[in-house]
């Protein structure tokens, strides 16, 4: 599938520390096996690091065979490193490719000189060549990079799997009722597609016929199958369960959920965090450090031993053993793995800095409705306070105004009125009163739906005892006003989510204080907070109040994470150190929010914190390994322990260098969410 291939390609390109590297990763496997054919005769016909074995695979003119094969190997097998080094120098960011290119170039050029001295010069004595080292160096480098690229690819494997979820074709239901198999790219918005049991749903859409259960585990991380009926949304890439359904297409191509997720993740992987910028800088300095140590070691050994072969071997070993690459990949590989795992589990990381900031969070502020509670209200009590209006008339007036709103409280009232067969009308001039409720005209009379705060602020009389009784039972209470008089009320209960209590306990165990922010009344807020174990509660808030509360907490030096609705809580999410938009569903492109939680599950807040902790731990491990390896390996390669007989050959240096990067990649791949 084209999309999948493009995503896979982008994943590699994002590691721009090794641009020369990325251009050639597809060739490493082929180049390794072709180079092996050239390298075997070179290795057999060359003295092993200057040591003559009891048996020799040589014949008259064999040195010419070695020269010709080494030249082919240098330009063919060494091409990724030579052109990669050239790219790095062109961008003024010399790194690992440049070091390897320098190492094999020095080995090859000096070997040409040795060949000339041994075959055409009248000078006595044998000049040692480096053709054996050159062949083994190039082979080991190609093998190491092939293994590494597999590991790098696996780091973003979850994302690649997501890209492969969409099928290549779909069954389109034509206007005449005929079915026709068409390519996914030919599907348009508003087309009807048919999906049989067990098939992958080709696009985002709405079920227009049939009912089924859907497996969304690979798309949103939702482990249980989700029951879907007519008018329910489905996500492209999820698996249809038991029934055949017809789906009206709502989004295709880049507008689809999966494409948006992969786009956001790719963007996050390409953005550099402060830790990554630092490691890039250190990796850049490492090139100059390695070249300097290599040149100094060459000069020092020439002065000590006056042996150009040994001194040159030290120089080449230093150049090939230094690995800025291990340092350069330390963070991007963990990031690729982390963001992919997150996306696979319905946690979209938009801002990578938030993963680092999450280690220092002091407070998590949460909206009550929909975050801590289900947001599925049930009407528990409704009452008229006016003798000439029945209770059902009050319900009808509430439902008329609320029919124009998509707030959970409004939807609950309208559904309840329908279930009671209470009719209601379409109101005129309905306006939202921010943080309070609604107002509008019904039969040319103005009605307002408000909360208790509004009544208190404006001096309205109401039954306070009834309010306290219902509120302490956990009800949200709305009042209906006509002609400056409270004429009725409605009380709605909400259920606390099962996972909320565990989430609060987990936060407290991490020394993070949970804070409830809600527009609901004090009594309801404290009743819910008490049940959950939250002691810090702010109730009866206007939308702008939440932002100022976050600002107050931050002014004392605290780091604040805000969890809320990506649209209604946008200012608060932007103000917080980390903004988490919860329950985004397929609308993952919400502008506000550093992290987007597809589901409305509070336990995903803990999953994000766990993923952040695990990610940072892997980053630190990789940085220590990347830096520590170079601190130890470069002086060893220079011959600092030669006096006790510990000398590393260029081939051993190349093996260690390749291993160092592979270890970083494997460590990144072991990152888990749990």
Curated annotation (Swiss-Prot):
Keyword Translocase: yes
Keywords recorded for this protein, A-Z: ATP-binding, Cell membrane, Copper, Copper transport, Ion transport, Magnesium, Membrane, Metal-binding, Nucleotide-binding, Phosphoprotein, Translocase, Transmembrane, Transmembrane helix, Transport
Active site (record annotation): 367 (4-aspartylphosphate intermediate)
Transmembrane segments: 32-52, 57-77, 95-115, 127-147, 284-304, 315-335, 623-645, 649-671
Membrane topology according to the record: Multi-pass membrane protein
Major localization listed first in the record, in broad terms: membrane
Primary enzyme class: translocase
Region (Disordered): 1-22
Keyword NAD in record: no
InterPro entries: ATPase_P-typ_cyto_dom_N, ATPase_P-typ_P_site, ATPase_P-typ_TM_dom_sf, ATPase_P-typ_transduc_dom_A_sf, HAD-like_sf, HAD_sf, P-typ_ATPase_IB, P_typ_ATPase
Entry's EC annotation: 7.2.2.8
Highest taxon listed in the record's lineage: Bacteria
Entry's localization field: Cell membrane
SUPFAM superfamilies, sorted: Calcium ATPase, transduction domain A, Calcium ATPase, transmembrane domain M, HAD-like
Catalytic activity: Cu(+)(in) + ATP + H2O = Cu(+)(out) + ADP + phosphate + H(+)
Basic and acidic residues bias spans: 7-16
Residues annotated for Mg(2+) binding in this entry: 565, 569
GO BP terms in the entry: copper ion homeostasis
Family in the record: Belongs to the cation transport ATPase (P-type) (TC 3.A.3) family. Type IB subfamily.
NCBIfam families on file: ATPase-IB1_Cu, ATPase-IB_hvy, ATPase_P-type
Role according to the record: Involved in copper transport.
The protein, known as: Probable copper-transporting P-type ATPase B
Gene from which the chain derives: copB
């Amino acid at each position: 599938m084209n999309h999948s291939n493009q995503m896979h390609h982008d994943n590699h390109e994002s590691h721009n520390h090794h641009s020369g590297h990325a251009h050639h990763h597809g060739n490493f496997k082929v180049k390794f096996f072709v180079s092996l054919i050239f390298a075997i005769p070179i290795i057999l016909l060359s003295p092993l690091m200057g040591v003559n074995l009891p048996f020799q695979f040589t014949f008259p003119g064999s040195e010419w065979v070695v020269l010709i094969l080494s030249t082919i190997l240098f330009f063919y097998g060494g091409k990724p490193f030579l052109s990669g080094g050239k790219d790095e120098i062109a961008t003024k960011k010399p790194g690992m490719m440049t070091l390897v290119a320098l190492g094999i170039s020095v080995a090859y050029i000096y070997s040409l000189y040795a060949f000339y001295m041994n075959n055409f010069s009248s000078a006595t004595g044998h000049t040692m060549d480096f053709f054996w080292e050159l062949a083994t160096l190039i082979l080991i480098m190609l093998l190491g990079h092939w293994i590494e690229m597999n590991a790098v690819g696996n780091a973003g494997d979850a994302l690649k799997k997501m890209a492969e979820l969409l099928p290549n074709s779909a069954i389109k239901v034509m206007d005449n009722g005929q079915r026709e198999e068409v390519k996914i790219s030919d599907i348009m918005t508003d087309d009807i597609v048919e999906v049989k049991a067990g098939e992958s749903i080709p696009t985002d859409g709405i079920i227009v016929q049939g009912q089924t259960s859907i497996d969304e585990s690979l798309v949103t991380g939702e482990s249980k199958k989700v029951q879907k009926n007519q008018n329910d949304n489905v996500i492209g890439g999820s698996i249809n369960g038991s029934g055949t359904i017809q789906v009206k297409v709502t989004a295709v191509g880049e507008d689809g959920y999966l494409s948006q997720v992969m786009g956001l993740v790719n963007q996050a992987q390409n953005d550099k965090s402060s830790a990554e910028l630092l490691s890039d800088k250190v990796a850049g300095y490492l090139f100059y450090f390695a070249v300097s140590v290599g040149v100094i070691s060459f000069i020092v050994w020439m002065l000590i031993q006056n042996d150009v072969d040994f001194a040159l071997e030290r120089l080449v070993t230093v150049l090939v053993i230094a690995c800025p690459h291990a340092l350069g990949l330390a963070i991007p590989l963990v990031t690729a793995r982390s963001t992919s795992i997150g996306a696979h589990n319905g946690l979209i990381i938009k801002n990578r800095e938030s993963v680092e900031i999450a280690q220092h969070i002091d407070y998590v502020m949460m909206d009550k409705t929909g975050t801590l509670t289900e947001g599925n209200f049930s009407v528990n009590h409704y009452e008229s306070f006016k003798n000439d209006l029945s209770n059902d008339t009050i319900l009808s007036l509430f439902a008329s105004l609320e029919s124009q709103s998509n707030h959970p409280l409004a939807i609950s009232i309208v559904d309840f009125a329908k279930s009671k067969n209470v009719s209601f009308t379409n109101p005129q001039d309905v306006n939202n009163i921010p943080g309070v409720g609604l107002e509008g005209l019904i039969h040319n009379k103005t009605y307002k739906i408000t909360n208790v705060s509004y009544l208190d602020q404006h001096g309205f009389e109401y039954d306070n005892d009834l309010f306290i009784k219902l509120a302490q039972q956990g009800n949200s209470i709305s009042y209906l006003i006509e002609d400056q008089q409270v004429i009725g009320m409605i009380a709605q209960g909400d259920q606390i989510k099962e996972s909320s209590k565990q989430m609060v306990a987990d936060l407290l165990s991490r020394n993070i204080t949970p804070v409830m922010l809600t527009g609901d009344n004090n009594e309801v807020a404290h009743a819910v907070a008490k049940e959950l174990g939250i002691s810090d509660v702010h109730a009866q808030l206007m939308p702008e109040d939440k932002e100022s509360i976050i600002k107050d907490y931050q002014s004392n030096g605290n780091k604040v994470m805000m969890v809320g609705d990506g649209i209604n809580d946008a200012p608060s999410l932007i103000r917080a150190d980390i903004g988490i938009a919860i329950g985004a569903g397929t609308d993952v492109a919400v502008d506000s929010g550093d992290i987007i939680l597809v589901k409305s599950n509070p336990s995903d807040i803990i999953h994000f914190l766990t993923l952040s902790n695990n990610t940072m731990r892997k980053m630190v491990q990789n940085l220590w390994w990347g830096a520590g390896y170079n601190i130890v390996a470069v002086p060893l390669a220079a011959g600092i322990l030669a006096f006790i007989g510990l000398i590393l050959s260029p081939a051993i240096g190349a093996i260690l260098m390749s291993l160092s990067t592979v270890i970083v990649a494997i460590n990144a791949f072991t990152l888990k969410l749990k």
